[in-house]
């Protein structure tokens, strides 16, 4: 069993998590639940899997995208064109106790700047030079928090 955030389909079920915050993956960061909560962990496992239609795997990163992707111009979801949101990757790291996963998220984020060295709203995970918003402070702040947490505070 997992958490739900929205139910708009004709069946009353919409199985997904999107990149924006608040999101299901952000629940512990928002103090909604404990990071070790079983229901949350089931939800997190789903959100970070191919079962989530907005989870994308690319050459430079894997992560959650969003129905409001403004890069591809394709109908969503579009697994063949993996557009991830850096804020969701930062949130994945911020809601992890696994140092390897946190380091992977930091690496992904640094690889997704498209040579600008700042975070963007959405990025093509196969070609980081394709992105929306030249500079987006929200994921920049989340990246800074994740970096500080990993390198200056003990991850518990």
What does each model-found stretch correspond to?
Residues 14-38, 79-156:
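C-terminal capping/lid segments that line or modulate ligand- or cofactor-binding pockets
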Residues 1-88, 96:
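Extended ligand-binding clefts on enzyme/binding-domain cores
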């Amino acid at each position: 069993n997992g958490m739900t955030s929205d139910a708009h389909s004709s069946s009353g079920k919409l199985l997904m998590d999107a990149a924006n915050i608040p999101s299901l993956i952000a629940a512990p960061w928002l103090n909604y639940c404990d990071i070790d909560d079983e229901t949350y962990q089931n939800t997190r496992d789903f959100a970070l899997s191919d079962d989530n239609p907005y989870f994308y795997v690319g050459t430079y990163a894997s992560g959650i995208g969003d129905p409001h992707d403004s890069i591809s111009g394709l109908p969503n979801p579009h697994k063949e064109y993996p557009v991830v949101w850096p804020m969701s990757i930062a949130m994945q790291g911020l809601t992890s106790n696994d140092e390897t996963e946190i380091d992977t998220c930091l690496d992904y984020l640094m690889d997704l700047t498209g040579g600008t060295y700042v975070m963007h709203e959405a990025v093509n995970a196969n070609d980081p030079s394709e992105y929306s918003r030249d500079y987006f402070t929200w994921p920049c702040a989340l990246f800074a928090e994740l970096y500080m947490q990993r390198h200056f505070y003990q991850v518990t």
